[in-house]
């Protein structure tokens, strides 16, 4: 049946096309957006997620349209993690979160929250300050010098920003010390910055007094940082036109700290004679275990309440706890223990840095139970809470990490109050050239889905991405995108197809949450995550790859076959172009090209044509 229909040509966006200038990719031009292949009659709860770089989503229209067009759910890569929203003093800034949630939900996307409780990317400066020993209130305050520098004799500074670019210079005087000549008012205070002191030995969590003898040609503020390149405290140091000894208190976050000064927003001269750090010599009293617990419940309450208020009820599902299970240890029942700051040779990726292990202080059960209680207290009434972890498809230990996680969920829920709704499996995996390795990982992916289904919990593939490994070495290096062959790209596409279909085959409809493709595009060579690997469904220029077709086949259960074999009418006039129902003109222009298109309805010569 054909019906007359007028169509306005609309150019396809680049993310709707395969790589230009290569006939191996032309078939990808004809596919619809990924989400159009979801069969909601069979899988009404399924959500197709895309890992999202939030700053890119908010600033790059091509990237934003790619996410909005292809996915039904968006997951922030980092923007909703604690360290992205909370500074070293516990101040919370959710402005980016609010803008992201509003933009995505107005585009019709479901926003999945990632993550409420974790040990990595935490505001550890703030948390460590909260747990710091308290000075003995019965003792008299007494300070002792820790470090000092007199610029009248020590005429040097450490690393500094470019003087010519930012319009400043430094000189030294035997009477006035360091003189900073600022001739340009810059956009940012940190445009002019320099290390005044380095390698200051401090005790983390302890408060120190800094005294600076300083003046300026006009009154102003020096901006400061005591810490390292990742963490620190940032008080301002006010000065006038007269010499003054200015005192500022700092709480040490980093044991071996530098002292940085910034004055990019000041025009004039700043004079600094000397700087001195002093520490309180009074005996400190550590918090009791009960005080530490209550302090962290306060911090967790403030964090979760703030995030839930920022999301305004729009984010209805969360990774409650991320990466809790260690890949080692014994919990006394033959399962792996929880991750902690010490004791696991292979279970912890990132001790130090911004890591803070809540369970070290709160206990393995209380940590998760408190997070769950607060999420349900402040979140929407219908909130769903997941435990998310990696290596749940582990073939080297027969899925022991997943079995351990399922056992830990039973422990957390044993109080009769805590309820975990679902399990998220990250699936940062590889496709293997070696058949033995490939079959082994596929066997344990199948077993993973079976175990998750048996748990009765909602099942979500939360961060799926894939590399490619050649040779027989199970732990061999992944092939870089630039070195991949067409056959290897297509083998990865087949692997994606198989995983998606295996999810639908093994996870009951009522337990399906969905699958999130963590890396939508290939990883740049300088990325800290699988740098230079072919992990995306689009390349770095936003063109579709063969893996896109693998996802389509997986979602669609293979190509539809109901009208397979029906031949095109040879009289069909394709000279005026072939269009999709949304009015976008396809690159196909011949009858043979129409024959090669995916099955569906198209507009040809002003009529609807079933192919």
Name every feature range the model reports, one short phrase each.
Residues 226, 245-276, 312:
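Extracellular beta-strand ligand-recognition surfaces/modules
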Residues 86, 128-139, 278-289, 324-325, ...:
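Aromatic-rich peripheral "rim/lid" segments of glycoside hydrolase catalytic domains that contact
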Residues 78, 129-140, 288-321, 364-378, ...:
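An active-site-proximal structural segment forming one wall of the substrate-binding cleft
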Residues 139-153, 178-184, 194-220, 244-252, ...:
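Extra-cytoplasmic beta-strand recognition segments
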Residues 189-195, 218-230, 257-262:
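Beta-strand acidic-aromatic groove motif in beta-rich domains, primarily in extracellular
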Residues 14-99, 103-143, 147-152, 158-160, ...:
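N-terminal substrate-binding region of glycoside hydrolase catalytic domains
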Residues 562-611:
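C-terminal outer-membrane/trafficking sorting elements
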Residues 166-189:
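Short carbohydrate-recognition loop motifs
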């Amino acid at each position: 049946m054909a019906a007359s229909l007028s169509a306005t040509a609309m150019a396809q966006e680049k993310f709707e096309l395969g790589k230009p200038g290569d006939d191996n990719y032309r078939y990808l031009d004809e596919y619809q957006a990924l989400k159009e292949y979801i069969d909601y009659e069979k899988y009404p709860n399924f959500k197709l997620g895309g890992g999202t770089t939030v700053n890119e989503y908010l600033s790059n229209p091509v990237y934003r349209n790619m996410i909005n067009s292809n996915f039904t759910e968006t997951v922030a890569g980092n923007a909703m993690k604690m360290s992205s929203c909370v500074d070293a003093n516990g101040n919370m800034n959710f402005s980016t979160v609010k803008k992201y949630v509003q933009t995505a939900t107005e585009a019709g996307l479901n926003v999945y929250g990632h993550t409420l409780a974790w040990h990595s990317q935490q505001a550890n400066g703030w948390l460590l300050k909260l747990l710091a020993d308290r000075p003995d209130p019965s003792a008299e305050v007494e300070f002792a010098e820790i470090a000092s520098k007199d610029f009248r004799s020590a005429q040097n500074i450490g690393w500094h920003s470019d003087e010519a670019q930012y319009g400043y210079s430094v000189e030294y005087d035997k009477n006035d010390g360091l003189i900073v000549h600022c001739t340009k008012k810059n956009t940012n205070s940190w445009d002019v910055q320099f290390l005044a002191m380095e390698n200051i030995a401090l005790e983390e969590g302890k408060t120190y007094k800094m005294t600076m003898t300083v003046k300026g040609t006009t009154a102003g503020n020096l901006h400061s940082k005591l810490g390292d390149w990742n963490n620190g405290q940032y008080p301002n140091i006010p000065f006038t036109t007269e010499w003054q000894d200015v005192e500022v208190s700092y709480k040490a976050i980093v044991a071996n700290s530098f002292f940085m000064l910034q004055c990019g927003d000041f025009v004039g001269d700043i004079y600094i004679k000397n700087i001195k750090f002093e520490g309180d010599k009074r005996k400190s009293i550590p918090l009791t275990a009960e005080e530490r617990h209550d302090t962290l419940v306060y911090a967790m309450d403030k964090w979760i309440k703030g995030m839930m208020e920022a999301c305004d009820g729009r984010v209805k599902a969360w990774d409650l706890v991320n990466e809790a299970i260690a890949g080692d240890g014994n919990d006394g029942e033959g399962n792996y223990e929880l991750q902690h700051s010490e004791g696991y040779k292979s279970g912890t990726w990132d001790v130090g840095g911004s890591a803070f292990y809540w369970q070290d202080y709160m206990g393995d059960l209380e940590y998760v139970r408190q997070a769950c209680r607060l999420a349900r207290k402040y979140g929407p009434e219908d909130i769903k809470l997941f435990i998310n972890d990696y290596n749940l498809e582990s073939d080297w230990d027969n899925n022991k990490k997943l079995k351990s996680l399922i056992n830990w969920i039973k422990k957390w829920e044993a109080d009769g109050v805590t309820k975990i709704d679902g399990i998220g499996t990250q699936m940062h995996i590889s496709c293997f050239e070696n058949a033995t390795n490939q079959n082994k990982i596929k066997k344990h992916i199948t077993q993973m889905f079976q175990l998750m289904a048996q748990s009765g919990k909602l099942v979500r593939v939360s961060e799926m991405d894939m590399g490619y490994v050649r040779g027989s070495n199970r732990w061999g290096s992944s092939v870089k995108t630039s070195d991949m062959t067409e056959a290897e790209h297509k083998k990865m596409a087949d692997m994606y197809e198989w995983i998606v279909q295996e999810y639908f085959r093994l996870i009951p409809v009522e337990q399906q949450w969905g699958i999130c493709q963590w890396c939508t595009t290939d990883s740049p060579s300088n990325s800290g995550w699988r740098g230079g690997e072919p992990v995306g469904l689009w390349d770095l220029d936003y063109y579709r790859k063969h893996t896109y077709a693998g996802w389509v086949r997986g979602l669609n259960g293979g190509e539809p076959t109901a009208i397979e074999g029906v031949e095109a009418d040879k009289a069909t006039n394709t000279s005026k172009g072939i269009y999709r129902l949304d009015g976008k003109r396809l690159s196909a222009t011949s009858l043979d090209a129409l024959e090669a298109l995916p099955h569906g309805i198209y507009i040809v010569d002003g009529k609807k044509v079933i192919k």
